[in-house]
């Protein structure tokens, strides 16, 4: 039997630190449920002490997700550890993840502490946390720039104090595969009680080496890999879960290890995370990019048609890309549609959500002759991540051209009242956004706007993503339609609804249509 590598997913914690990404509690629970289906071993649900929202999200995930270990991050302080335990104690498999910097530059300039103080603090806080929680992980922040002799002392001390996992982060993405592999071997050879703990690794992608470094660490004896879906994370991101897992699976002959990941759930998981975060997956991204299994070269196409193994080292089906054997259109019935949803992996949708998605499908089928899986995927995701509609876009009309100022008139429904406004703008989309702002009485900043085609051909849908900001908080949302202006208006309204939902979710009656 080959060695098992534990997959520690940090999409909900480190992944959420991606610039311009902000997840609400429902987003996090939805992603956590999908990670459960993916069969990750560990879910780092958040940093409970960071905010009330993070605390509530970790608590909700701890109480609702079974199977994976649920982790809460904490600084090396009793206050942080107490907060993390309060959020985690409802989990069947809780773990507190304590971090404390150990590099000279961090100790001197950030912590203002001497090495002996850091050593004592690390051991004391692990010992304290172990008195609360059955599983403790410790991370010496900036480990790869820490003096090895000091790092060995810290690791030995925290393991003796009760740490079950010691995580070795390449915090600034500075190391290389050869260096990192040697670094892990040095730990195994010089920390006398290292066999009493699992060695974990956490690599950042600043030099584009996060996955390579993680794999080098596995070859050198690491047993747990911290990673994120689509490689999300601060700066250039974290090691991509899908790439690590499929490298281990595809090159089992080289790594001589395995994971328990259900690889057929990878594509769906990537798609859900992309939708929720608003972070598009680049087309040539390994494993989950739109072109990952595309062959344009005639020579490559000929080879694949004759024998897939000529140019494909893994099958699309192995990561959840399934061929569509049912053609859906405006004459398709609910039964065939539901069967197709099941084929796509959506087997646990409620009757209400299924009915709403089918309704949207029939509306789309009246506009499009050919319905693709991408179209259906967009409809499903928009319904899954739907928040209560305080504001509804009932009607819009634009007047535009290259010699006139674009004007948009919108009608918004709020609490049964109809609000109509018109506005001018720099193009029909800008005019529509301004009209919606006037009608809803909001004042937000548009941070991002981008669009992509869903499907192909002249009747392809447009999927618009917008990010708005209010009082330092960012809200992202999507809209889909065969009409770009309509898709844009829907996305903007959805973002506004998300803003109001998160602001007034405990008392939606506060919303008025003044």
Curated annotation (Swiss-Prot):
Q: What is its EC number?
A: 2.3.3.13
Q: Which stretch is the leader sequence? A: none
Location(s) in or outside the cell: Cytoplasm
Q: Which SUPFAM superfamilies match?
A: 2-isopropylmalate synthase LeuA, allosteric (dimerisation) domain, Aldolase
Its pathway, per UniProt, is: Amino-acid biosynthesis; L-leucine biosynthesis; L-leucine from 3-methyl-2-oxobutanoate: step 1/4
Q: Where does Mn(2+) bind?
A: 14, 202, 204, 238
Residue ranges, annotated region (Regulatory domain): 392-514
| Residues in coiled coil | none
Tell me where on the tree of life, at the top rank, the source sits: Bacteria
What HAMAP family does the record tag this protein with?
LeuA_type1
Subunit text: Homodimer.
Family stated for the protein in its record: Belongs to the alpha-IPM synthase/homocitrate synthase family. LeuA type 1 subfamily.
UniProt protein name: 2-isopropylmalate synthase
């Amino acid at each position: 039997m080959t060695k098992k590598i534990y997959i520690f997913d940090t999409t909900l914690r480190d992944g959420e630190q991606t610039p311009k990404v902000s997840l609400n509690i429902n987003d996090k629970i939805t992603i956590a449920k999908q990670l459960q289906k993916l069969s990750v071993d560990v879910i780092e649900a958040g940093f409970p002490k960071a905010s009330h929202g993070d605390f509530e999200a970790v608590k909700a995930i701890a109480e609702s997700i079974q199977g994976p270990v649920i982790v809460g991050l904490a600084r090396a302080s009793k206050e942080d550890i107490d907060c993390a335990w309060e959020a985690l104690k409802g989990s069947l498999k809780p773990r507190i993840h304590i971090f404390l910097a150990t590099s000279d530059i961090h100790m001197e300039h950030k912590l203002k502490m001497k090495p002996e103080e850091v050593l004592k603090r690390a051991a004391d806080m692990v010992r304290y946390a172990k008195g609360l929680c059955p599983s403790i992980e410790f991370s010496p922040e900036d480990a790869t720039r820490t003096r090895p002799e000091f790092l060995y002392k810290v690791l030995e001390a925290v393991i003796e104090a009760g740490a079950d996992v010691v995580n070795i982060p390449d915090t600034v993405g500075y190391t290389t595969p050869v260096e990192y592999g040697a670094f892990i071997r040095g730990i195994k050879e010089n920390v006398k009680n290292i066999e009493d703990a699992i060695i974990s690794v956490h690599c950042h992608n600043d030099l584009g080496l996060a996955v390579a470094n993680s794999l080098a660490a596995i070859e050198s004896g690491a047993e747990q890999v911290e990673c994120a879906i689509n490689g999300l994370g601060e700066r250039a991101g974290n090691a991509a879960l899908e790439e690590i897992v499929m490298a281990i699976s595809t090159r089992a002959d080289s790594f001589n290890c395995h994971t328990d990941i259900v690889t057929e759930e990878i594509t769906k998981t990537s798609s859900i995370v992309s939708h929720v975060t608003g972070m598009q997956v680049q087309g040539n991204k390994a494993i989950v990019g739109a072109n990952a299994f595309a062959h344009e070269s005639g020579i490559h196409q000929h080879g694949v048609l004759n024998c897939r193994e000529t140019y494909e080292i893994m099958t699309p089906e192995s990561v959840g890309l399934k061929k569509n054997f049912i053609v859906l259109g405006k004459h398709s019935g609910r039964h065939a549609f539901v069967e197709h949803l099941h084929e796509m992996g959506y087997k646990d949708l409620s009757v209400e959500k299924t009915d709403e998605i089918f309704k949207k499908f029939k509306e789309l089928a009246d506009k499009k002759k050919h319905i693709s899986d991408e179209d259906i995927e967009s409809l499903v995701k928009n319904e899954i991540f739907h928040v209560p509609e305080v504001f509804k876009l009932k009607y819009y009309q634009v007047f535009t051209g290259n010699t006139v100022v674009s004007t948009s008139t919108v009608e918004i429904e709020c609490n049964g009242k109809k609000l109509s406004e018109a506005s001018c703008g720099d193009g029909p989309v800008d005019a529509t956004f301004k009209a919606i702002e006037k009608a809803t009485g909001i004042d937000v900043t548009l941070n991002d706007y981008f669009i992509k085609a869903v499907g192909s051909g002249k009747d392809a849908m447009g999927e618009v993503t917008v990010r708005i900001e209010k009082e330092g908080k960012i809200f992202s949302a999507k809209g889909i339609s065969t009409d770009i202006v309509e898709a844009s208006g829907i996305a903007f309204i959805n973002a506004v609804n998300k803003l109001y939902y998160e602001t007034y979710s405990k008392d939606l009656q506060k919303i008025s249509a003044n």
